[in-house]
């Protein structure tokens, strides 16, 4: 949570922003600050021209179905320069209207994108995966966000393509590529800490400046790129008003492996980026309350939560918030911490809690609650499928990811991906 203290003139500007009204003279300093903090977001405006965006498609074509998909995808970008990197596909790629570069050995998506990136001569480059789709008009519209020189990447929402299968219904609700309906500044530790490279639009020079994608990573290379850009002070934006689609995994085995590999990449990312990958981030008071829950000490749970509520409310009230809103925000902060703790229990820490539950029976209730309650809450907002099926698929999703995390931890010989990030107090800004 970030809070800002505003002058009277600043409050007038903030109110105008909230209502979508014309801004008063002298607003630039405040609006720039709010944009850089991710507190407000720019509107889509004048679109880029197709000839200014090169489309890069990393491709591994296994069969005629993949070839047909590639041809249809390329046909969407007839007015763009298109470069396809054939990453040693079993079928040789030959597509009209595209430059094809072939790797003699399979080097992975990061290397495939970098190979094509070297040949790009336009100001902007769009990376589009074979199993994703977006129109030329949508990409050009998305490019209107490149107004500020400090914006290096803009990304659309990547929704899951729905079909008749239960897996497809689940992916529509909980796809790992879909970052939601709200715009955001992409940065570590935020509501949108990363976006997938399934569809990504970037300034060519900026991606080259940071060295492109990390070719040593088979998975998580998109997250690594975005975090390196963030560390370099380059802004990356997520804009869900523009939405592409992605074909979800067709079988439970492929579904499991996808999540497993995402978990596997977490350990590599943690080695390179440390606390950015922390499965749980909170302050010392919330940690105290959670330890008290594990220890079955309800009195201390209440005391720690009360201290968290009072301290948060007072801090917000002191910087100018009204008391009722300060109290409501403090409660929301506690609820959010509980949810992220439940996510950590069922994802990164699942195996640890299963082992500990053998010796500490009270943890079984925490595991059960962390599995069932968030799943039911998420299902109730969509009701796209049978609730039991949703809970089971969500559990498989988390179990697959957790197994990948622990395998990655053992491979990297580092527990960084399992370590929570604990702060003494709330970060204060403004």
Regions found by a protein language model. Give the residues of each.
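Short, flexible, basic/aromatic active-site loop/helix in glycosyltransferases
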Residues: 156, 171-192
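Glycine-rich, basic loop-to-helix element that forms the pyrophosphate-binding segment
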Residues: 103-120, 184-193
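Acidic donor-binding loop at a coil-to-helix junction in glycosyltransferase catalytic cores
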Residues: 219-225, 258-261
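Conserved donor NDP-sugar-binding/catalytic core segment of glycosyltransferases
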Residues: 137-169, 247
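Short aromatic/hydrophobic "clamp" motif used to bind/position activated sugar donors
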Residues: 125
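N-proximal low-complexity "stem/linker" segments adjacent to membrane-targeting elements
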Residues: 3-6, 12-75
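Active-site-adjacent helix/loop segment of glycosyltransferases
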Residues: 239, 245-301, 316-390, 394-397, ...
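A conserved acidic beta->alpha catalytic loop
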Residues: 61, 86-94, 105, 132-135
């Amino acid at each position: 949570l970030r809070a800002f203290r505003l002058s009277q003139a600043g409050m007038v500007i903030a109110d105008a922003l909230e209502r979508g009204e014309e801004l008063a003279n002298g607003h630039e300093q405040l609006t720039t600050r709010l944009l850089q903090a991710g507190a407000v977001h720019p509107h889509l405006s004048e679109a880029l021209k197709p000839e200014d965006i090169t489309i890069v498609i990393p491709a591994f074509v296994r069969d005629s179905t993949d070839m047909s998909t590639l041809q249809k995808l390329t046909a969407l970008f007839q007015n763009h320069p298109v470069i396809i990197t054939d990453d040693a596909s079993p079928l040789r790629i030959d597509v009209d209207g595209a430059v094809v570069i072939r790797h003699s050995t399979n080097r992975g998506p990061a290397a495939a994108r970098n190979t094509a990136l070297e040949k790009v001569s336009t100001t902007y480059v769009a990376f589009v995966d074979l199993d994703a789709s977006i129109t030329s008009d949508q990409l050009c519209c998305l490019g209107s966000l490149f107004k500020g020189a400090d914006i290096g990447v803009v990304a659309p929402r990547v929704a899951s393509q729905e079909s008749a299968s239960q897996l497809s219904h689940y992916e529509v609700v909980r796809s790992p590529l879909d970052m939601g309906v709200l715009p955001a500044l992409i940065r570590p530790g935020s509501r949108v800490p990363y976006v997938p490279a399934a569809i990504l639009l970037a300034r060519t020079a900026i991606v080259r400046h940071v060295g492109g994608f990390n070719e040593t990573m088979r998975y998580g290379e998109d997250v690594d790129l975005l975090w390196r850009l963030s560390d370099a002070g380059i802004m990356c934006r997520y804009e869900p008003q523009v939405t592409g689609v992605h074909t979800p995994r067709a079988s439970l085995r492929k579904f499991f492996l996808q999540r497993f590999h995402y978990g596997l990449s977490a350990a590599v990312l943690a080695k390179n980026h440390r606390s950015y990958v922390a499965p749980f981030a909170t302050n010392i008071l919330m940690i105290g309350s959670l330890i008290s829950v594990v220890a079955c000490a309800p009195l201390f749970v209440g005391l720690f939560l009360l201290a968290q509520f009072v301290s948060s409310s007072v801090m917000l009230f002191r910087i100018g918030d009204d008391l009722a809103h300060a109290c409501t925000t403090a409660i929301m902060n506690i609820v959010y911490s509980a949810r992220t703790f439940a996510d950590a229990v069922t994802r990164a820490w699942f195996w640890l809690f299963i082992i500990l539950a053998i010796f500490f029976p009270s943890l079984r209730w925490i595991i059960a609650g962390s599995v069932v309650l968030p799943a039911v809450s998420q299902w109730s907002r969509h009701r796209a499928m049978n609730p039991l099926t949703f809970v089971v698929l969500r559990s498989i999703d988390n179990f697959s990811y957790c197994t990948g995390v622990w395998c990655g931890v053992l491979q990297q010989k580092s527990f960084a991906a399992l370590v929570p990030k604990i702060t003494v107090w709330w970060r204060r800004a403004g």
